[in-house]
């Protein structure tokens, strides 16, 4: 995980979701799920987790059990210092519990239609074809 973290920090920088949205004008959304099933999955973005660091959310999204271990999320304080985000919780890829949280996204952004591209190869056996 250390190499992945270094790669992400080098390429994504130390940006929070709020900073990334301000810099790009884009709404980045990353779905993560708690490793402990007693909590609900989250959508991390500039509205729900403005101070969470994007690289830590990407790490959590890569944490597929057996391949990568669950991780803690990191946020950035007003003074630039890093601090744990929900420190008692470790996070994994959102597809473990809620791959594409369409209803939450619709409420957050007041949208009626969604176009999504599924790029997770491990989910293919569970997909249903419209032609069947």
Located regions from the model:
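Patatin-like phospholipase
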Residues: 1-132
């Amino acid at each position: 995980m250390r190499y992945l973290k270094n790669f992400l920090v080098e390429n994504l920088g130390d940006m929070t979701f709020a900073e990334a949205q301000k810099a790009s004008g884009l709404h980045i959304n990353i779905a993560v799920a708690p490793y402990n099933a007693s909590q609900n999955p989250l959508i991390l973005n500039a509205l729900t987790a403005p101070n969470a660091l994007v690289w830590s959310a990407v790490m959590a999204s890569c944490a597929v059990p057996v391949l990568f271990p669950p991780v803690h999320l990191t946020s950035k304080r007003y003074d630039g210092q890093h601090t744990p985000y929900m420190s008692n919780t470790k996070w994994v890829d959102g597809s473990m519990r809620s791959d594409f949280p369409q209803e939450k996204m619709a409420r957050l952004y007041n949208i009626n239609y969604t176009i999504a591209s599924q790029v997770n190869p491990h989910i293919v056996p569970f997909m249903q074809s419209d032609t069947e």
